[in-house]
């Protein structure tokens, strides 16, 4: 009788060698809503100009655990007045095991933010709506394309520097 090999062999002594990624928790790390021009801003007839900025950061939070933070800054202005300003840091803890080191940056800076963004978008929209402004629906973002664009820019910059300079 031949011995069967399979999933049991990969679990020697309780260890699994297959890549594993799991979202452990997601949370609002920081949230600020400012309405500095109230109450006069509510009488302004024009629509505010909206400026949205994003930033993504990641750091190791423990063994096989990484925190990914999506920072969203939204500022609405009407002329010289600030209608509102929202600063949100929405984060997630990801358990990552048996993933090659070269695959971590694409996951942490592209895939993880893609998973967090819908929830961060809702938190920002709720804060704006609760400030008595029309809810702002942020368009989906292709974090993968942004990651690739930034990686290409870094590669081009590195190639443009003469050898020996840092």
Swiss-Prot record:
It is found in: Cytoplasm. The keyword Translocase does not apply. GO terms for molecular function: unfolded protein binding. One of its GO terms (cellular component) is cytoplasm. The keyword tRNA processing does not apply. Belongs to the SecB family. One of the proteins required for the normal export of preproteins out of the cell cytoplasm. It is a molecular chaperone that binds to a subset of precursor proteins, maintaining them in a translocation-competent state. It also specifically binds to its receptor SecA. This is Protein-export protein SecB. It comes from Rhizorhabdus wittichii (strain DSM 6014 / CCUG 31198 / JCM 15750 / NBRC 105917 / EY 4224 / RW1). The gene is secB.
